[in-house]
Amino acid sequence: MKLNSNINNNINNSSNSNNNFDAKNIIVDTITPPDPSVEFERKLAKSIFCLVHFIVYCVIIFRKGTILDQAFKDKDYFYLIWTHCVFFFAIGTYFLISSKRPGFVSLSNQNLNNNNNNNGSSNKFILEDSMGCIPQLNINPTPNYSKISNIKRKLKNSSGDITKNQENEDLVPLMEISKNIDEDSINDDTITTTTTTTTTTSTSTIPEISNDDDDNNNENNNDNVNNRNNNNSNGEKEDNDIDKLKNHYFCKKCLVDIPLRTKHCVKCNRCVLKYDHHCVFIGGCVGLNNHKNFLLFLLAESLLLLLGLRIIVTGFVRENSIKEWIFSNIAIIPPTLLIFGGLCMPFALFCFHSFLILTNQSSWEFNKYQRITYLKPFSKRGINPFNKGPWNNLKKFLKGDENPSDWILLSKYEVDQMKKKEENTFNIWNNKYYSCCG
């Protein structure tokens, strides 16, 4: 099987084109309807949430002896009004977070960097070679789809074992393909290309940067290979990893260029800006656009559950024996346990997300810090490249003016300066003399 000269010329021309990615041009999708399965999950979550709250509300109201029941009897309208305001405030914040989009990357971003007024708009394809490397090909103007499919099939079958990403195979670093492809080297058995890519060799959320990148870049330069110093320090390797990082990636599911801090959600089947997590309680993702609403919901729900616990414990009847006590209070024991257990989770999440906001992180980045491509080189240094200080992080979060164009990785010099600043600032919990956090 051979590629015709037209396709070769298109690949060579596209490799020489300027493919600069500008995060300012990212379009957030607010129109496209969600996937039917996601919409069903959201409706189911809303139904369960409302049903549980309605049942607990009825138990609290009709239970004799509670302070709420006493307020109804005494016609204490002030107490009734503010308690019900807390209840409806929590319900309102839930419907707000469950209906607001997290910040999906619009599929129209497929042609962001192309001139749509010209006939030469490029189309993006992902091909895997025999080493599991995934370059981005911009084939211009129109690819031969049958040959591309055959190439992709050949590439997958040419290697017996292709190491693939176990968690998320959708995000790959956006690299440039080499300028020339030797047409004579393409045959029915193998397809060889000279590319600068990142091999997906681990079970990370997005492919990690391998220390073998230097070998791949210099495999055709025997002098550099022979003169390679095998005793490089860990600091030098980390610096090299930082230099290789890119400020944007490519999603092979959505076929769009995406900025940093963006992840493809398997359940929503969309790329989410500043992906935090997929929450089953709201039936959707938490991301850039609804993280503030999610924090507000956690606060309102915590206050509601705390108030509900305060009211329901006043409805317990005292008895002489444990058996009689259980029999007399059997109706409110399950709701009490439900409220107490429910209170622990949103309050703990509220505290955790408050910490994430002050440090400018997401749950995904916090949990997978050492496995995410663009954060892995910084993990050994203990630096968050997006942290601008607690006060600045909080102001940007509350104003809601955070932009994907602000998510730019630090240079080696900036990392070293931040490290020196942290070393010079004495921290009672973690410093150069001892660490209380391991």
Curated annotation (Swiss-Prot):
It catalyses: L-cysteinyl-[protein] + hexadecanoyl-CoA = S-hexadecanoyl-L-cysteinyl-[protein] + CoA. Its EC number is 2.3.1.225. It is found in: Membrane. InterPro entries: Palmitoyltrfase_DHHC, PFA4/ZDH16/20/ERF2-like. The lineage of its organism: Eukaryota, Amoebozoa, Evosea, Eumycetozoa, Dictyostelia. Belongs to the DHHC palmitoyltransferase family. One of its GO terms (molecular function) is protein-cysteine S-palmitoyltransferase activity. This is Putative ZDHHC-type palmitoyltransferase 7. The DHHC domain is required for palmitoyltransferase activity. Residues 249-299 form the DHHC domain. One of its GO terms (cellular component) is membrane. Glycans are attached at N12, N13, N119, N144, N157, N231, N360.
